[in-house]
Amino acid sequence: MRLWPALFAALAAAPAQAVELQFCWRGAAGYSMTGLMRFPDALRDAALVTQDDITAFEITGWRHGERLGHWSLEALGPDTSWLLSFDPIAMRFPMTGIGVFQAWNAGGAVDDCGAPGFGFNAGNGGQDVCVDGRFVTESTIPWETPLYAGTTPVTPACDGAPMLSGTHPLRTPPAPT
């Protein structure tokens, strides 16, 4: 029966499975953002995934295909604006409510992403980006614009990204049990 402790040790050492998704946001005036996030597989069918559940996250800002900046969860500090909600069933970031819905290194004033820096914000005023500590007003699109995530790689042009559709074509069904 010495096999059981070895089996438990091996299972404990095995990495937990994670859901990895990519997303692409297309703002106004040639601005876009690509991103990647991971969260535990056990939350694949949860009602909501929040910033507290995310195990890896990174975003890169672009304008007309030129890189503007980058932010990742590894740079999270006590003063970083960090608010995220994601619906893993619909594979979309909810953009409803009052106030700020998403704050990825950019709070409500969209000017706290650092210099150099990049951040994204979505709230009642719209969806927009922060570049080098500056609110880029010309990037703003309507707050209710859907933002989806999927398993397909994305490009700064958001080509093929499931962004503005009523259904999400890239939802990966759970593996058969």
Q: What residues fall within each predicted segment?
A:
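Absolute protein N-terminus
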Residues: 1, 18-19
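Sec-dependent signal peptide recognition
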Residues: 1-9
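N-terminal signal peptide c-region/cleavage motif recognized by signal peptidases
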Residues: 13-15
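An extracellular/secretory-lumen and virion-surface interaction module
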Residues: 19-177
